[in-house]
Amino acid sequence: MAFENKIVEAFIEIPTGSQNKYEFDKERGIFKLDRVLYSPMFYPAEYGYLQNTLALDGDPLDILVITTNPTFPGCVIDTRVIGYLNMVDSGEEDAKLIGVPVEDPRFDEVRSIEDLPQHKLKEIAHFFERYKDLQGKRTEIGTWEGPEAAAKLIDECIARYNEQK
């Protein structure tokens, strides 16, 4: 049986091109400006998370969705997960899922991070390697993993979330 990519609902907090880091306050049901990036850098893709997951850093599992155009905070995108970036942020593992919109025909053939232009992967890695430099915080970029590893990571984060409930 052939592998099928995971399809998830990505809850977007930060649109592509933004320098503002928004976070959703679940208790109050509002988006709050967490901070403006200290560095003159911009988010290279839609940035959000998967609801009902718990990553190793204690937050929901992060996801970047590569889109044709920016969306808005609160947008939910049906997303085909194509891999993830291993990284460490302030000493904690902080994987970043990578996906593409199911409902955009420009990405119909994209099933793996290998289907993206290598330059796009370099942009994403560079952003996360440098975006906290002027805050004096360190991040470390690890390896890229494919869709099968991403599916396993999602399942682990769902199980961790369910154990914490």
UniProtKB/Swiss-Prot annotation:
Compartment list: Cytoplasm
Cofactor: Mg(2+)
Alphabetized UniProt keyword annotations: Cytoplasm, Hydrolase, Magnesium, Metal-binding
GO biological process: phosphate-containing compound metabolic process
InterPro entries: Pyrophosphatase, Pyrophosphatase_sf
EC number of the protein: 3.6.1.1
CDD domains with a match to the protein in the record: pyrophosphatase
GO molecular function: inorganic diphosphate phosphatase activity; magnesium ion binding
Name of one Pfam family that matches: Pyrophosphatase
Binding site for Mg(2+) 1: 57, 62, 94
Effect of residue 47 to F: Loss of activity
Record Gene3D superfamilies: Inorganic pyrophosphatase (3.90.80.10)
Main location: cytoplasm
Effect seen on changing residue 131 to F: Loss of activity
Residues that hold Mg(2+) 2 according to the record: 62
Complexes and interactors: Homohexamer.
Family to which the UniProt record says this protein belongs: Belongs to the PPase family.
PANTHER family: INORGANIC PYROPHOSPHATASE
Protein name: Inorganic pyrophosphatase
Record gene name: ppa
